[in-house]
Amino acid sequence: MTLNQIILSLILGLSLMTTIIKSVPMDPTIYIEGTIFDQWPEYNYNFEKTNPGSNVKTLGMVKAKLNSTTKVPELSSDDTKTSPNTLGTMQYPELFKYHFTSNVDAPASKNSGKNLPMKIQFKLDQDNSGFYTFFNQTFFPIDNMGYDVDPSFRIYKQSGNYHNFHFCVKMNSRFTYNGGEVFNFKGDDDLWVYIDDKLVVDVGGIHPAQDGSVNLDTLGLIKNKVYPLDLFYCERHTDGSTISIQTTIQAYCAWYDYCGVCGGTGAVCCNAKANCDDGDLCTIDSCPQPNLAFPDLQSVYKNCSHIPKDCPPANKCQVNSCDKTTGNCKPENLKCPDRSNECLKNTGCDDLTGCKYVSICTDSCDKKGNACVAGKCQQKTTSDCAAELDDNSCKVYSCNSTRGGCYSENKCKPDPTQICDVASCDDGACSIKTLPPDECNCGCKPNFCQKSNCVKNPSNNQFECSLLPADGIDDGNACTEDICDAVAQKITHVPYDTCKGCMSCNPSNGDCEAHNEVCNDFNACTENVCSPVKVGAGVGECVTTNTTCAPTTNVDKCKNYLCDSEKGCYETDVVCPDSGNCKVGHCDSKVGCSLKPRVCKSPAFCIVAECDETVGCIAFERRCASSNPKCKAGICVNGTTPEEGECESVNYDPKPFICQTGAIVSTAVIAGVTVAGAVALGIFIYGGKRGYDYWKESRSISMSSAVSSPMYVPSANASENPLYIPEGEL
């Protein structure tokens, strides 16, 4: 459960109470809270060092629009030679971001930007004129704290007295616009105030105390609407530090992190390197989300996150893993899977498509199409050979790789010792016919490669010898040359070598034909085709193209069209990344990824739900505007179904003097005014205008501020502070 949720439940419970409020006391005090960053000049040369001719109020140093994601100002230019950067002594623009963001883990070295964050609170008391004020002519809120816990850092002085002159303050608050509010500032050095992310007070640079103010009625704000108020203040140079704030803005904190810092990041009490290190170089250690609630700091540290380091491969032929000894991603070549059980042999890997293979079933008697069972190539059967050749029922088919593959023999054969027997076949049925002696005994003397054949001569009506090739010479395969050696009495069948590459001979007709299966690399992400190099040349080459998984029309831009080397094409949903915590990635099938504002829902009218870039959705009590801010307070009343809630205005109790109708100015008041006038006159006479100004600014003004950080403050009673981490051990 987040801290915000706990607070929300309490607020909601109170806000649902139906008690009618007729009057409320006026709040005499408001607090503006945030983070103060201790800056040591040796770590950031934007502090203490000055450019010739600077020492003046400098406008335009920062952009007029606050970065809505980081909630930290950005310089208008990174060029040190621009007038604002020169006059404002911004010698190292790249370090400006560390004026207002934590950089604890930077090395303790020159110009590293290292800083130390702590909690700070400004207490503003309401004076007699209705202004909430904070005034301090010697504003040194972190003396002996932060770096200066170590006495060796206490080297900067004012009139011989040590002070910490180098710090920056970041305060992110909210307020409900009533109308008529003003904000007045006087001090040194930098001060930038943003309202609704727009720069409204610009007092930049290293300089003596300077003024800046804004009347909120000039900003086009909407009454009763909640706006962010972001204040950024730096003290960058000796030997004075003055601050004066007068405002009628009733600023408040919407939420706190587990360190108790308003709108904090958790950096004040949790450092990932010091508090979350799990000793595993292959995990990314980080502190918990800052708006989570914990009973103590040890619980914070126990809930650190340790995310395994992501090491994505650079291509499909690489595996990338984290090296436990170095914490670096270590790429290695992919070991392609062993597919020998499929009769496949690996031939390498393609960066785009992955592992490639060839079939080992390439023998002329192996079945086509990589027929494989348990790693063994399947042989062609008589049926396979019959289909491959002429499929004649009067022939017997066999396969012999030495003979070039499939071949055939006549099914019906006569007894070679009976020269007058003639075999015949009819639809696979054999029959023997015995010829008359004069038709078969015609004086033939065949050799090994011949057989007797008697043919009747029409001229004399006698049978004469006409030898024929011996049975068995013709194997029925048009892709082999049939050779018979009568002397050696040997018949051979030599395959023709006319078809090359991925082309092979058709045994039924002897033509060279392209065979795509020869080119198959058994990668489902490629298309393999055998293409003739030249028409009629009998030579083919394999052409491989990568498979296109995306459709040619109506492409869904919210789908990733991917390919797996074994499974082929598949789809995954596009994950549109968020931008910060308040812009949610959204996908439209027509246009793809875009960003939408995160919607934070409120459970009741008197609860404001909105998105904060630091943590996401937050909820806080609605502060209502007043119809008469000087005399009445705005209060929120939740509605009951179906009525909505509303804001109302009720009288302050007791009523301010100005709100008392027909009030009589008493002698006590007159006496008070007279005494005050006498005091002022006396100060003016004996102290001069400077003394009078000091008295005028300081009367009825509290000079209170509070700073704390359990990590950077030593124990007050000289015992060991378990949360204090000495410099150099972070």
Swiss-Prot record:
GO cellular component, one term: membrane
Membrane protein topology class: Single-pass type I membrane protein
Transmembrane segments: 668-688
Source taxon at top rank: Eukaryota
UniProt keyword Glycosyltransferase, yes or no: no
Name listed for the protein in its UniProt record: Protein psiL
Family annotation (PANTHER family): PROTEIN PSIB-RELATED-RELATED, PROTEIN PSIL
Domain PA14: 125-265
Cytoplasmic domain ranges by topology: 689-730
Similarity remark: Belongs to the prespore-cell-inducing factor family.
Primary location class: membrane
InterPro entries for this protein: Fibro_Slime (IPR011874), PA14/GLEYA (IPR037524), PA14_dom (IPR011658), Prespore-cell_inducing_factor (IPR051154)
Stretches in topological domain Extracellular: 24-667
Stored PROSITE patterns: PA14
